[in-house]
A protein has these predicted regions:
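A short glycine-rich, Lys/Arg-flanked "PGG" loop and its adjoining helix->strand segment in the class I
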Residues: 145-160
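Core SAM-dependent methyltransferase catalytic element
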Residues: 217, 223-246
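Class I SAM-dependent methyltransferase SAM/SAH-binding core
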Residues: 66-121
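A short acidic, Gly/Pro-enriched loop at the edge of an enzyme's catalytic core
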Residues: 120-131
């Protein structure tokens, strides 16, 4: 990882001021919001849908449960939660363009609310939700420790949080292939489909800067979560991290 201090943080492979990172991330998602779901399908060969299904299957939604989908973007995970037995969902995202895109694509979905807000300062009362998720969003948060504490705060006692995030591949051969696809192909596709090569260069770089699976598990524990576990999917290309508020 790059060397950082109290005033600086990584933005991909660049070091930027902490106060500037959120605006830089917003610019990335403002640029690609209307093509975000399409690009997910193309760059993952549609496998991102199965990763999200794995999250929902591990969570096993119940009809009395309300979900907070933090950094929820266009609402894919919230939709799956509702379609698999959950009662209602809030999609919380700091980027208004992503929320707008989600509202258009999920306009016929009932029991869903949309909220523009930072994961580091969620304007929701303590002990509100039975379940919380974050899919491919924690990498983009400036203060990840604070975001995890906020998730813990808004969960009810007995509540559960599952985070789906790009992680670190453990097989050397798969890692070599994955690196070629990530660094050579994804930015090119981003340029041709979404009109923004730099956004997908940032995406690839931010994945490599993200904590390892054991490191993120430790962050969960430090935020207060109990029974912390993780599962690797696709040989560690992504992982699911689970923690409970007990």
């Amino acid at each position: 990882m790059l060397v950082k201090d109290n005033k600086n943080i990584d933005f991909g492979y660049k070091i930027v001021k902490k106060k500037d990172k959120q605006n830089l991330v917003n610019n990335v998602f403002n640029s690609v919001a209307d093509k975000y779901d399409l690009m997910n399908d193309i760059t993952s060969f549609g496998i991102h849908r199965e990763w999200k299904n794995n999250l929902i299957n591990w969570m096993a939604p119940q009809k009395n449960q309300k979900l907070a989908d933090i950094a929820g973007g266009t609402g894919d995970i919230a939709r799956k939660f509702l379609n698999n037995g959950g009662h209602s969902a809030y999609v919380i995202d700091i980027n208004e363009e992503m929320i707008k895109s989600g509202k258009v694509n999920k306009k016929n979905l009932k029991n869903i609310e949309w909220l523009v807000a930072s994961a580091e300062d969620i304007p929701i009362d303590d002990n509100t939700f039975e379940r919380a998720t974050m899919g491919f969003g924690l990498r983009n948060v400036t203060n990840r420790a604070q975001a995890l504490k906020e998730v813990y705060r808004i969960l009810k006692p007995g509540g559960r949080f599952i985070c789906l995030e790009f992680s670190h591949v453990e097989n050397e051969l798969i890692e070599e292939i994955y690196n070629f696809w990530s660094f050579k192909c994804m930015p090119y596709i981003g340029e041709k489909v979404a009109g923004d090569r730099s956004a997908y260069t940032y995406l690839v770089e931010s994945i490599r800067q993200f904590p390892t699976q054991p490191e993120l598990s430790e962050m969960f524990s430090e935020a207060g979560f109990s029974r912390v576990k993780y599962r690797n999917l696709s040989n560690g290309i992504v992982s699911l991290h689970s923690g409970w508020k007990l």
